[in-house]
Amino acid sequence: MAQFDTEYQRLEASYSDSPPGEEDLLVHVAEGSKSPWHHIENLDLFFSRVYNLHQKNGFTCMLIGEIFELMQFLFVVAFTTFLVSCVDYDILFANKMVNHSLHPTEPVKVTLPDAFLPAQVCSARIQENGSLITILVIAGVFWIHRLIKFIYNICCYWEIHSFYLHALRIPMSALPYCTWQEVQARIVQTQKEHQICIHKRELTELDIYHRILRFQNYMVALVNKSLLPLRFRLPGLGEAVFFTRGLKYNFELILFWGPGSLFLNEWSLKAEYKRGGQRLELAQRLSNRILWIGIANFLLCPLILIWQILYAFFSYAEVLKREPGALGARCWSLYGRCYLRHFNELEHELQSRLNRGYKPASKYMNCFLSPLLTLLAKNGAFFAGSILAVLIALTIYDEDVLAVEHVLTTVTLLGVTVTVCRSFIPDQHMVFCPEQLLRVILAHIHYMPDHWQGNAHRSQTRDEFAQLFQYKAVFILEELLSPIVTPLILIFCLRPRALEIIDFFRNFTVEVVGVGDTCSFAQMDVRQHGHPQWLSAGQTEASVYQQAEDGKTELSLMHFAITNPGWQPPRESTAFLGFLKEQVQRDGAAASLAQGGLLPENALFTSIQSLQSESEPLSLIANVVAGSSCRGPPLPRDLQGSRHRAEVASALRSFSPLQPGQAPTGRAHSTMTGSGVDARTASSGSSVWEGQLQSLVLSEYASTEMSLHALYMHQLHKQQAQAEPERHVWHRRESDESGESAPDEGGEGARAPQSIPRSASYPCAAPRPGAPETTALHGGFQRRYGGITDPGTVPRVPSHFSRLPLGGWAEDGQSASRHPEPVPEEGSEDELPPQVHKV
């Protein structure tokens, strides 16, 4: 049986994100000239602390926040102990009389201190309760651990504080008003002065992101490839998603940083996991470790459950009293945050996208209120409100009514009932357009299953979107159930996937010079992980197992290039971005738009625009979203997609961050007529955009540009997927330990590169290499990205990345027997399957 070598290898120089000639560079600095920040060993932790200090708005805010977290834990434990052991509830509930005077017949007013037990009685009751003593001892040990960790972190963050002041020259008072891009630019400049990393002369933006997001990128890839057990089919409820903070913590503990994890340190995978010869033994070892951690979770379940209940009660009781409808609000689920996250996307960037999509997402979910539920809510509000009105009127007439037993309780419950019922009654003046709302949501969240488009009005789409955008009450309930469910998921669902996880980390881990071991998906290389239906046809050599799903590679690459305009992408990424820009220019030229504005004003445009803020970039998105249904007669669905694609392309083509009254000067003027990427790249060095306000404006326009690109790329993907719907469908099978090969692809040859369908209004297709427009447009991208000479597909030799790796994914009609290479015997009884991925 043919077998392949899956030996982990060092990343090639063209993939290392290093300047030529610096791949094995070791910078030497004289002893007397070393700065305090020369050769920082753990750059992952250092850059993460730099980022955290920026996000927490400086050292003082971070210090006070950490102190309050310690105080919160003490308060919850102490207050709960006091309520259990030091309160006489018979007096509090008036079941026992209290006499303060010498005359028992005189009426006595009970005060709150009367219900408190004396200190001696309270102490005796605590000592008699063995369970309470055990819980207090465990809580005390945990609090002391947090206190020691707090002191250590303060010492470390004081060093980061000094780094901001002396190396980056950013005072703490100005830090809350500095964007992360400004801080990152100063870090890149500081590398040249202090040699923070001695393995590279210069740091890039991608290096910093890789250091901060090393483990997060692995988690995003694991969710993208459906390797983590997060979806379950429940009897009577159908498919459900369960992903909580406790479950995520256990995943990270097992895989990344816990004792016996897969990583030797923050930046290096253990050597045995880089070789395929012991994969079965390593999988068994991982399975046993998951079992023991699951058992530990089961034993600690009572304590964790008590803590979860108490913390949720103290956190949400006041909110529920003040705003009863708060639990009816929605939030982005933890699974949704991981599914929607780009590779190399920091937490504040993700949060900004999701915040922009929150209002349209809420309005979309409100479109599906049940008519029966609305009818019941209206009548329930009527009956409860009538009784409440009578009680309030009686109270106004005579306040002694409140002294009647349970009157105040009844008033409170009736008020909560009325508030809850009103939350299920839709606004009678609101007009809902589910398809338009879903398109607005897509513009911000960037990811969406293909079958949602055109089916926004269906309950199935609503239910699937609810997995990403869940009720706050459901979120709290899942967190409360997490201590019980997490051990079951670890023992019975995660353990059977141990072999697939081992294969995943071996096949998709690469070593980057000056960075260490990273997830290969985080390199955003369309050649190795691109999807042919996401504009990568002819530019990717990835098998179905190697390609990222839902266009994650392509959209992540576009997002990172727009967010970091100074980044120089690799050759293949530059070719992809150039091809996308060329397609945008062609589709934009095909759209006939009115002079003086993108789209005319109309009622639907105004209603869609009301979903957004008043800023100009978001209004541009509203124009594009409303355009396809506001102008012209109804068209068939395929022609509507072409028209919509042309409109988005026109918006991108004319997109410019300059306000109408500003006059561009110099080099910026010549680039503003191109895509937004070029415009912002040129303007980032211009005096027009200097200052903090200009940085925020550029960030807003970058977000809008990415939203337009997401709409455009999804439309292209939809049309290309319709052309070949079954070619790139993949599924995950159980790990094959027998080494059997995949189905033979014998007769199928290499696929020819396919061109992306053009707009329906585009008259004809000129050959790409000879088109003068292509040459001119690509010249701008050459100046922007360091350039290539040919805008077409980059010629390359056949790569070992075209092989189909382990893990059980198989491409329809294809075999796994490509480029057979024998594996030398290692004396191991583990047998490798013939589908491998060599990095």
UniProtKB/Swiss-Prot annotation:
PTMs per UniProt: Ufmylated in a DDRGK1 dependent manner.
Q: What is this protein called?
A: Autophagy-related protein 9A
Task: Please name the gene that encodes this protein.
Answer: ATG9A
Q: Can you name the source organism?
A: Homo sapiens
Q: Which GO terms describe its cellular component?
A: autophagosome; endoplasmic reticulum membrane; endosome; Golgi apparatus; Golgi membrane; intracellular membrane-bounded organelle; late endosome; late endosome membrane
Q: How does it sit in the membrane?
A: Multi-pass membrane protein
Q: Outcome of N265W?
A: Impaired autophagy
Intramembrane bits: 291-301, 320-328, 471-480, 484-492
Attached carbohydrates are found at N99
Q: What is the lineage of its organism?
A: Eukaryota, Metazoa, Chordata, Craniata, Vertebrata
Biased amino acid composition, Acidic residues: 737-747, 823-832
**Which residue stretches are annotated as topological domain Lumenal?**
85-128, 398-406
Instruction: Briefly state the protein's biological role.
Output: Phospholipid scramblase involved in autophagy by mediating autophagosomal membrane expansion. Cycles between the preautophagosomal structure/phagophore assembly site (PAS) and the cytoplasmic vesicle pool and supplies membrane for the growing autophagosome. Lipid scramblase activity plays a key role in preautophagosomal structure/phagophore assembly by distributing the phospholipids that arrive through ATG2 (ATG2A or ATG2B) from the cytoplasmic to the luminal leaflet of the bilayer, thereby driving autophagosomal membrane expansion.
Q: Name one GO molecular function term.
A: phospholipid scramblase activity
